[in-house]
């Protein structure tokens, strides 16, 4: 099972961090990427299987480095350059997602017509996030929110406010496949679980898909 806290922690989470000054002044400058945004992702919203997502992933095979979640980490300097890499010929079937790791990004919700996924705030205080209309989709991390029961409650709260729900893994956790079963059980239609080479959850979803047959596919983002 996954540990209570992963490698990615946010501003609304208790955290003990030793040698803070050394990390901030010596280690961080040597390791931190030049990109302003934390992650660039693909969402194969027009797909009926994982094939399209996998093909976009393999289209980036010339990128050099791989992160702990299986994603490519090429040496690029600008956000635009990262976006230009996400091409595999599926212009109408794949949309781009970005983890901006920002605490104040909700102003885009009303004007841009995009899905804004809340992370730390929705975990610690989903009622506040809903009342402030800070986002329109919940990123559901079971090992961050605390329990399966609390996860179900958060999902219901999000859906009652007209939000989407994206079930997510967490950096640094185990290969446990439970969230694959959870996302199918909740019928949210969205899962964030790293690149295809981290295949445990994808394989579990494929097994569930095979068992459910024609009743398996659900696309909440389809217009």
Swiss-Prot record:
Q: Which residues bind Mg(2+) 2?
A: 99, 119
Sequence positions bearing N6-malonyllysine: 87, 215
**SMART domains in the cross-refs:** Enolase_C
Q: Which residues form a coiled coil?
A: none
Query: Which pathway does the protein contribute to?
Result: Carbohydrate degradation; glycolysis; pyruvate from D-glyceraldehyde 3-phosphate: step 4/5
Catalytic positions? 69, 141
Key word Manganese present in the record? no
Location in the cell reads: Cytoplasm; Cell membrane
Q: Which cofactor does it need?
A: Mg(2+)
> Known InterPro entries for this protein?
Enolase, Enolase-like_C_sf, Enolase-like_N, Enolase_C, Enolase_CS
Reaction it catalyzes: (2R)-2-phosphoglycerate = phosphoenolpyruvate + H2O
Enzyme Commission (EC) number: 4.2.1.11
Outline the subunit composition: Mammalian enolase is composed of 3 isozyme subunits, alpha, beta and gamma, which can form homodimers or heterodimers which are cell-type and development-specific. ENO1 interacts with PLG in the neuronal plasma membrane and promotes its activation. The C-terminal lysine is required for this binding. Interacts with ENO4 and PGAM2. Interacts with CMTM6.
Name the family the entry cites.
Belongs to the enolase family.
Q: What is this protein called?
A: Alpha-enolase
**Gene this chain is encoded by:** ENO1
